[in-house]
Structure formats: C-alpha cells, structure tokens
Amino acid sequence: MSIKYLGLSEVNGPLVVLEGVKNAAYDEIVEFTVNNQEKRRGRIIEIYQDKAVIQVYEGTDGMSLNNTQTTLTGKPMEL
C-alpha cells in the first residue's frame, strides 16, 4: 500500500528530509511528483523517529518544500 505526503521538510543536494512519516522502511522506493507533472524516484537511506532521509536519483533541482508530492511505495529497491 502506498502512502502520499505533500511537502518536504528539507532539501540538501541530492537528499531530502520528510517529517511525519509513518510505516516507512529502509531502502523503500519513493516516487516524487514535482510541479504536478514531473516524476522522480529515490530511496529511503535513513529513518529516525518520524523522519526519513531520501536520496533522489534524478536530483533535487526545482523541488519545492511546499508543493512536492511524495509517495512511499511500500516496495523495496530491486535489481
């Protein structure tokens, strides 16, 4: 089951921090919707309490703290 969040807490280089996260897992695949159209992917690389640090594969340029939609897919990274 996927869970969606609106907004980000912090953007720093290729990493973003999402607060208020529940039931997230290490290495979980994350999908971002930027400006209601562009899709990007990433994975959770650290979880602490209700915060998740996510590595964004396509970079964070143009990602808004207020309008970026984040979807936790509930699926681990697979090769």
What are these regions, as identified by a protein language model?
Residues 1-4, 10-79:
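Acidic-enriched and Gly/Ser
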